[in-house]
From Swiss-Prot:
Organism: Drosophila melanogaster
GO biological process: axon guidance; compound eye development; heterochromatin formation; Malpighian tubule bud morphogenesis; muscle organ development; negative regulation of DNA-templated transcription; negative regulation of transcription by RNA polymerase II; neuroblast fate determination
Official protein name in the record: Protein krueppel
One MF term in the entry's GO annotations: DNA-binding transcription factor activity, RNA polymerase II-specific
SUPFAM superfamilies: beta-beta-alpha zinc fingers (SSF57667)
Residue span of region Disordered: 115-164, 178-202, 399-427, 445-502
Length: 502
C-alpha cells in the first residue's frame, strides 16, 4: 500500500514538473533551456501558482491530468516505478517516449552539467534547434536520483571535452588531407621555417607558409647596366661600377695614389709600413697580399692550372699566361716615354735606363728567380738565336741557328783556316742550315718536376688591382693594370726608395 501511494506521489510530482516546464517554455518562446525542478516542493509551488484556488496536491494533480494524455500518464507511472527500483533511465526512454526520447530526461541531464552555486545558472544550448543543452548519455553513467551531487557527474564533463577535442582533431586531419589531395599538383607540407627540404612551390601553394630556401635566380639579383654582370650584394655592384666610371674615392696619404676599394688601400698601406702578414708554411717567405702567398704555394705544389691554347704551355698564374700570350701576338704594351722603347713586361720597363743599351734579358724571370721550375724567357731565346746566327754567318755564311745538341768538345779547339778546313766548316754550316730554330729551345727546357702535392687552404681572391707604390709611366702600362706581376709588390718598398734616389 505504501509503495502504491509513493508511486502516486511520484507520478503527480512528475506531472507537475512537466506542466511547469511546458508553461515556462511558452513564456520564453522556446529561446532558452531551463533547468528541471530541483525537488517536489518547487514543482508543487509552481503548480499552485498556476492554480491558486486549489490546494497544493490538488493543483498538481489537476495540472498533470489536464496536460497529459492517458498514455503519457501510464508512462510516467512506469517511470516512477523504475526510479524506485533503481533502473537505468536509458532502458526505458526509447520505449516510453518514441516520439521524443529526451523530452523527460534531457532536462535532468542538463541539471547534471550545471556549475556549482555562485556561477552561471543555465547551461548553453547544445544546438539552435533544441532548448535542451545536452542529449541523454549512452547509459554508461546511470542516475540514481535527480538530486545527485556534482561530483558524481564530473566524468560526464570530461567525456564531453574529450569528444570536442576528437572532433577538432578530425577536422584538422580532414583539412590537411584535402590540402594534400588538391588537383593543382603536389604541394609540400607546411614547414616551420627550419627545414631546408621544404623548397617546393606548387600551383596552389600555401599562402601562409614562408619560403625557406632562396630562389637560385635571386642569388645574384644586382646587375650592372653596362656589362650585364650580376652580383649578390649591392655594395659589390657599386664597387664594380667604379671600374666603368673611373671613380677612385680612396686615396693614399703617403703617395696620393687612389683606389676604387677601401681594402685595396689597406693592402697598399702595407707597402709603406713594411708589414707582411702572410707567411708561407713551407719556407720563410712573407707576403703583403694573400694572392701572392697563394701564387707562391704553387711553387711548392707544382700546380700549373693555366694552359696556353697555342703552344700548350702551362703557368701557375693567370698574369703569366697573359704575358705569355703577348709573345704569340707580338705585342709590347709597355713603352718608355723618353726613348719610346717597348717591352712586354712591366718590370722590364721599370729596370730600363734611357741612353744606355739594355743588357740581354736574363733567361730566368724575376718572379721565378730562386724557385723551381725555371721559366724560359722568350726574349732570351731570341737573343741567343741571333748570336748563334751571327757566328754561323761569320765562319760559314749561314744565318741558321747552331745545333747545340750535336756539339762536341772538339769544336772548342782552334779553327782550321786552310782550304780543307774551310770546306769542312762550310759543310758543317750547311748541315746546320737544315736545322730549325726550334732546336735551340730544347736545350733550355727542363723535365717537369716530380714534386708531391702539398695541400693548402687559402681564402678567396678578389679581382686584381695595381697596389704598387709607383704610378704608371705610359698609357700602355696604364691599360694593362690587370697584367701586373704581383710579385713585385713584395719588393716595392726597395724599388720605391731606389727611384727616389735617382
Amino acid at each position: 500500500m505504501s509503495i502504491s501511494m509513493l508511486q502516486d506521489a511520484q507520478t503527480r510530482t512528475l506531472a507537475a514538473a512537466l506542466a511547469g516546464i511546458k508553461q515556462e517554455d511558452v513564456h520564453l518562446d522556446r529561446s532558452m533551456s531551463l533547468s528541471p525542478p530541483m525537488s517536489a516542493n518547487t514543482s508543487a509551488t509552481s503548480a499552485a501558482a498556476i492554480y491558486p484556488a486549489m490546494g497544493l496536491q490538488q493543483a498538481a494533480a489537476a495540472s498533470a491530468f489536464g496536460m497529459l494524455s492517458p498514455t503519457q500518464l501510464l508512462a510516467a507511472n512506469r517511470q516512477a516505478a523504475a526510479f524506485m527500483a533503481q533502473l537505468p533511465m536509458s532502458t526505458l526512454a526509447n520505449t516510453l517516449f518514441p516520439h521524443n526520447p529526451a523530452a523527460l530526461f534531457g532536462a535532468w541531464a542538463a541539471q547534471q552539467s550545471l556549475p556549482p552555486q555562485g556561477t552561471h545558472l543555465h547551461s548553453p544550448p547544445a544546438s539552435p534547434h533544441s532548448p535542451l543543452s545536452t542529449p541523454l548519455g549512452s547509459g554508461k553513467h546511470p542516475l540514481n536520483s535527480p538530486n545527485s551531487t556534482p561530483q558524481h557527474h564530473e566524468p560526464a564533463k570530461k567525456a564531453r571535452k574529450l569528444s570536442v577535442k576528437k572532433e577538432f582533431q578530425t577536422e584538422i586531419s580532414m583539412s590537411v588531407n584535402d590540402m594534400y589531395h588538391t588537383s593543382g599538383g603536389p604541394i609540400s607540407p607546411p614547414s616551420s621555417g627550419s627545414s631546408p627540404n621544404s623548397t617546393h612551390d606548387g600551383a596552389g601553394g600555401n599562402a601562409g607558409c614562408v619560403g625557406v630556401s632562396k630562389d637560385p635566380s635571386r642569388d645574384k639579383s644586382f646587375t650592372c647596366k653596362i656589362c650585364s654582370r650580376s652580383f649578390g650584394y649591392k655594395h659589390v655592384l657599386q664597387n664594380h661600377e667604379r671600374t666603368h666610371t673611373g671613380e677612385k674615392p680612396f686615396e693614399c696619404p703617403e703617395c696620393h695614389k687612389r683606389f676604387t676599394r677601401d681594402h685595396h688601400l689597406k693592402t697598399h698601406m702595407r707597402l709603406h709600413t713594411g708589414e707582411k702578414p702572410y707567411h708561407c708554411s713551407h719556407c720563410d717567405r712573407q707576403f703583403v697580399q694573400v694572392a701572392n702567398l697563394r701564387r707562391h704555394l704553387r711553387v711548392h705544389t707544382g700546380e700549373r692550372p693555366y694552359t696556353c691554347e697555342i703552344c700548350d704551355g702551362k703557368f701557375s698564374d693567370s698574369n703569366q699566361l697573359k704575358s705569355h700570350m703577348l709573345v704569340h701576338n707580338g705585342e709590347k704594351p709597355f713603352e718608355c716615354e723618353r726613348c719610346h722603347m717597348k717591352f712586354r713586361r712591366r718590370h722590364h720597363l721599370m729596370n730600363h735606363k734611357c741612353g744606355i743599351q739594355s743588357p740581354p734579358t736574363p733567361a730566368l724571370s724575376p718572379a721565378m728567380s730562386g724557385d723551381y721550375p725555371v721559366a724560359i724567357s722568350a726574349i732570351a731565346i731570341e737573343a741567343s738565336t741571333n748570336r748563334f746566327a751571327a757566328m754561323c754567318a761569320t765562319y760559314g755564311g749561314s744565318n741558321e741557328s747552331v745545333d747545340m745538341e750535336k756539339a762536341t768538345p772538339e769544336d772548342d779547339g782552334p779553327l782550321d783556316l786552310s782550304e780543307d778546313g774551310a770546306s769542312s766548316v762550310d759543310g758543317h754550316c750547311s748541315n746546320i742550315a737544315r736545322r730549325k730554330a726550334q732546336d735551340i729551345r730544347r736545350v733550355f727546357r727542363l723535365p717537369p718536376p716530380q714534386i708531391p702535392h702539398v695541400p693548402s687552404d687559402m681564402p678567396e681572391q678578389t679581382e686584381p688591382e695595381d697596389l704598387s707604390m709607383h704610378s704608371p709611366r705610359s698609357i700602355g702600362s696604364h691599360e694593362q693594370t690587370d697584367d701586373i706581376d704581383l710579385y713585385d709588390l713584395d719588393d716595392a718598398p726597395a724599388s720605391y726608395m731606389g727611384h727616389q734616389q735617382h
